[in-house]
Amino acid sequence: MLSFKNDTFKILQIADTQEGKKISPDTLDLINSALDRVEPDLVVYSGDQIWGKRTFKGNRDAIKNSLDILTKPCQNRKIPFTICFGNHDRQVGLSNEEQFEIYKEFDCFVGESEKDIDGCANHIIEIKDGDELKFLLYLIDSHSNLEIGYDNVHENQIEWYKKKRDSYEEKYGRLIPFSTFRYVKFLSF
């Protein structure tokens, strides 16, 4: 369970590390420095953690090793972390669903992908203050297209969000404050 501490809850977002098999020491230095400075209660890796179809060629062990190294700074500090996917993650030759299962093997990972809606890693994280639900994080898959690289949030994901939001409001008698994380911004017209 994630909780406020002294009326605060710090989230550190890490995006676009875009690493391959050999993780740059500069990337790890940056992550470690940010964790030490911010002292977050949660880290959100918000897409394109890894990339490189020619680099990984679907090799699960190599992919798991790189993801483990990228999240090890959180694991070593016992800081909960979660993810959403970007447009390059699946280009490593392993589906986002398979990668999500890898993340679930790591210490300190939080999140469970919702079923029966488009995408992977659509999930909600509840943040409490004592027993009271204070805040929600909606993590939403913005998909990718292997041909052009980008896609967007699908209609049934928006409907999922609305249903979840409304069910929380009905259960708690108020709209629960929230933030969303996704890789690609929502389309607007």
Predicted feature locations:
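Active-site environment of divalent metal-dependent phosphoester hydrolases
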Residues: 20-22, 51-54, 83-95, 145-148, ...
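Active-site-proximal segments of metal-dependent phosphoesterases and phosphodiesterases across multiple
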Residues: 63, 172-189
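Active-site neighborhood of phospho(di)ester-bond hydrolases with catalytic His/Asp-centered motifs
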Residues: 12-15, 43-48, 81-87, 177-180
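Extended active-site neighborhood of metal-dependent phosphoesterases/phosphodiesterases
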Residues: 3, 64-174
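Active-site-proximal beta-strand elements of phosphoester/diester hydrolases
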Residues: 8-18, 134-144, 178-180
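N-terminal active-site segment of His-dependent metallophosphoesterases
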Residues: 1-69
